[in-house]
Amino acid sequence: MSSATSPIILKWDPKSLEIRTLTVESLLEPLVTQVTTLVNTSNKGPSGKKKGRSKKAHVLAASVEQATQNFLEKGEQIAKESQDLKDELISAVEDVRKQGETMRIASSEFADDPCSSVKRGTMVRAARALLSAVTRLLILADMADVMRLLTHLKIVEEALEMVKNATNEQDLAHRFKEFGKEMVKLNYVAARRQQELKDPHCRDEMAAARGALKKNATMLYTASQAFLRHSDVAATRANRDYVFKQVQEAIAGISNAAQATSPTDEKQAHTGIGELAAALNEFDNKIILDPLTFSEARFRPSLEERLESIISGAALMADSSCTRDDRRERIVAECNSVRQALQDLLSEYMNNCRYGTWMDESSKSGRKEKGDPLNIAIDKMTKKTRDLRRQLRKAVMDHISDSFLETNVPLLVLIEAAKSGNEKEVKEYAQVFREHANKLVEVANLACSISNNEEGVKLVRMAATQIDSLCPQVINAALTLAARPQSKVAQDNMDVFKDQWEKQVRVLTEAVDDITSVDDFLSVSENHILEDVNKCVIALQEGDVDTLDRTAGAIRGRAARVIHIINAEMENYEAGVYTEKVLETTKLLSETVMPRFAEQVEVAIEALSTNIPQPFEENEFIDASRLVYDGVRDIRKAVLMIRTPEELEDDSDFEQEDYDVRSRTSVQTEDDQLIAGQSARAIMAQLPQEEKAKIAEQVEIFHQEKSKLDAEVAKWDDSGNDIIVLAKQMCMIMMEMTDFTRGKGPLKNTSDVINAAKKIAEAGSRMDKLARAVADQCPDSACKQDLLAYLQRIALYCHQLNICSKVKAEVQNLGGELIVSGTGVQSTFTTFYEVAGDVIAGGRDSQLSLDLLPSCTEGSLFGSGSRDSTMLDSATSLIQAAKNLMNAVVLTVKASYVASTKYQKVYGTAAVNSPVVSWKMKAPEKKPLVKREKPEEYQTRVRRGSQKKHISPVQALSEFKAMDSF
């Protein structure tokens, strides 16, 4: 089979001058450059200077003539070889020859007299005509290539029809072999065309069509063979017709992409970001208005209508079957908050119009002041929409975590039923499989709805469409196998559709993972594993073997998915300390924690499954379950180590949520102290906004000190320098303590805060020991005294931090009323002032004075005020103590280094590295190979290619067309 008999229709206007391939563009570019240079040789009017000949112009004219001659030779060769566009190509070659001759004469005359505007105008018109003629010749040559591709497509279509019309298996094998040969040829030609296409969307369409053709061609033979062998089974015809349709659509896709025709409506539906994400983006843009021109009648209805549309979409997500009750409540609460924030914002706009308060004398340029009420209202509105986005993302991630768990189980159950030949059972499991497939598609579309990743959304929607169309055919293959369970052909057909389904589900899973945040995934997975751990413990205590087995399986599946996704994520980063730490946590979970958990599950199920339940160590199971949760949490902590504070802020609600849930579960520890059913951290999170604002001010000051410490320790390599290691440890613990005052972080109760303070004191003691050793070796007495003075500060502030944490422990709740145990607090402060006095008396007066006394004074900590004010005072005292300690650590690190340099200067190069610690500059941090892109950056992303100022031949050609003749 070598040629097609029916005519080939080219969906391309030969008169069009649209350049569609990179080859045509690259061939045309030199000629455009030469002509442009020639025309611009003299762009000035008549001159009073003596006229003369321009050697450069003559050289350029000759180069244009030579380039035209090359086009003529190539064009004549293509015209001789072409079968379909021979006449058009010959005509185009003659036109180029004619326009080339005109251009040669005009350019020669212009080169002789470059100052003549008339001759210049004549040459411009000739150049325009020549470029148009050459462009048309190249496009016709490009069309000839497309015609050759379409000829191959026609041959493949005929071969496909021959396969479809095969009457027996032997005939099918022969015809399919011929079809395979033509497929190889077509794939080669299509791949070349794909590389040539200029439009990236057309290249994507070509790649997708080629992939679909290759994928379905492998299914074509088994589906056709099953139909020929079992033509009496209706499902076999459905399988065969489906595969043929897919192959035909792939061939049509190659044809459309090769000709760069407009995509179908279905493909256009796949483009664009998520509907809900787009609506939120547009709403965020619309709320920023010019206050001086604000009109309530004009803007209020529009903004309210947009918001209600967004809330309707959020409500649909909240009402979905897989949305958890607590998540639904949060979405509803955020919707109400957004509504209220919009009303507050509109009120501020009206107030500004009424009273003109938006601009003051110092900002008449129109710039909003930071503390302006309108600016605050806009920020609040933006924050509320961001909070709503976060809850919607978490809701979608809830769905993904549940639906994309053990995705192959419904399929395996269906196949096992089919192998047994039980058609009734197959139909029952087919319904389960269909519901599972529908759920995957639904969840994928939900993920798309809130994603700003346009390319990722397109891939997810295309993969979901494939899942939707493939699902009935998998069921048909199962029905065929159920009808003929002993048939090898039916089994092979089932295996092919099974493999195709699993591949497509993997594609969909990876596509969904690409448009969702790893941080959101870890946050939700951690929460779900905690829920499952609690269910396991309850099932264990109640002796419910089925629930225990099923839930333990879910835990294993969730943990395996966490490990897989994080390992894949780390491949995007260059190997370094960060990736090593993350991979260590995943390795620990997969190789140590999960095997132990599986072993304990097996022991528990075996003990409970006997007629007489056997006793076993319940605490061992609980510990193994707890380790799974802790392992996932450690992975999440390791992943978040390089996140910015802004990125970590999005996880703030979950930080509060998971620990509070944990404190009320069956795996809570003995030190989980609760006040009226709430942890101390939860109580801190419920403080009034005014109190939170005051705490936030203190935290901001603390962060300033922290940034100083970060800058200092970032200079040094901590290998061989325990002072830097201890400084980092103290910084991390102090961050956790300040997070506690805001109702966040891992510290949950007052006992946790006390333990954290003890750890800081221990680290401070170790730092004191090391730094004193450095001071002892320092020959410079001034540096030595400075270092010792800073060490005294550390001792003082560690003691102060201990006191502030212990004072919080004296706060108890009796009968719902917050009181403070005065005895404990008084004794604590008595001890403190004695120690503080000794420290200050022993230090240098220039370094330490009475102003270093702790900020957590007696009056601020005794419960004379309300519960909220008491909590506020203790919180601010804790933050101030941490800030003071942070500052002392910074000064100690600096002084230790200075003291070490003095030691080196005195004792020479033999002591470059101190016996106590080694001061080595830290190597530059390694950057990820692939930049992590925030979802909101996809809209505003600028591609590198667009930054280059490159004028395409088409643009230059259009400039010639726009030039006026002289």
UniProtKB/Swiss-Prot annotation:
<dbReference type="GO" id="GO:0016342">
    <property type="term" value="C:catenin complex"/>
</dbReference>
<keyword id="KW-0217">Developmental protein</keyword>
<dbReference type="GO" id="GO:0005198">
    <property type="term" value="F:structural molecule activity"/>
</dbReference>
<feature type="compositionally biased region" description="Basic residues">
    <location>
        <begin position="941"/>
        <end position="951"/>
    </location>
</feature>
<keyword id="KW-0965">Cell junction</keyword>
<dbReference type="GO" id="GO:0030424">
    <property type="term" value="C:axon"/>
</dbReference>
<dbReference type="GO" id="GO:0051015">
    <property type="term" value="F:actin filament binding"/>
</dbReference>
<keyword id="KW-0966">Cell projection</keyword>
<dbReference type="GO" id="GO:0051823">
    <property type="term" value="P:regulation of synapse structural plasticity"/>
</dbReference>
<dbReference type="GO" id="GO:0045296">
    <property type="term" value="F:cadherin binding"/>
</dbReference>
<protein>
    <recommendedName>
        <fullName>Catenin alpha-2</fullName>
    </recommendedName>
</protein>
<dbReference type="GO" id="GO:0005737">
    <property type="term" value="C:cytoplasm"/>
</dbReference>
<dbReference type="InterPro" id="IPR006077">
    <property type="entry name" value="Vinculin/catenin"/>
</dbReference>
<feature type="compositionally biased region" description="Basic and acidic residues">
    <location>
        <begin position="924"/>
        <end position="940"/>
    </location>
</feature>
<dbReference type="GO" id="GO:0007409">
    <property type="term" value="P:axonogenesis"/>
</dbReference>
<dbReference type="Pfam" id="PF01044">
    <property type="entry name" value="Vinculin"/>
</dbReference>
<keyword id="KW-0130">Cell adhesion</keyword>
<keyword id="KW-0221">Differentiation</keyword>
<dbReference type="GO" id="GO:0015629">
    <property type="term" value="C:actin cytoskeleton"/>
</dbReference>
<comment type="function">
    <text>May function as a linker between cadherin adhesion receptors and the cytoskeleton to regulate cell-cell adhesion and differentiation in the nervous system.</text>
</comment>
<dbReference type="GO" id="GO:0016477">
    <property type="term" value="P:cell migration"/>
</dbReference>
<keyword id="KW-0963">Cytoplasm</keyword>
<dbReference type="GO" id="GO:0048854">
    <property type="term" value="P:brain morphogenesis"/>
</dbReference>
<keyword id="KW-0539">Nucleus</keyword>
<dbReference type="GO" id="GO:0008013">
    <property type="term" value="F:beta-catenin binding"/>
</dbReference>
<dbReference type="GO" id="GO:0098609">
    <property type="term" value="P:cell-cell adhesion"/>
</dbReference>
<keyword id="KW-0472">Membrane</keyword>
<dbReference type="GO" id="GO:0005634">
    <property type="term" value="C:nucleus"/>
</dbReference>
<dbReference type="InterPro" id="IPR036723">
    <property type="entry name" value="Alpha-catenin/vinculin-like_sf"/>
</dbReference>
<comment type="similarity">
    <text>Belongs to the vinculin/alpha-catenin family.</text>
</comment>
<dbReference type="GO" id="GO:0005912">
    <property type="term" value="C:adherens junction"/>
</dbReference>
<dbReference type="GO" id="GO:0048813">
    <property type="term" value="P:dendrite morphogenesis"/>
</dbReference>
<dbReference type="InterPro" id="IPR000633">
    <property type="entry name" value="Vinculin_CS"/>
</dbReference>
<keyword id="KW-0206">Cytoskeleton</keyword>
<dbReference type="InterPro" id="IPR001033">
    <property type="entry name" value="Alpha_catenin"/>
</dbReference>
<feature type="region of interest" description="Disordered">
    <location>
        <begin position="924"/>
        <end position="952"/>
    </location>
</feature>
<keyword id="KW-1003">Cell membrane</keyword>
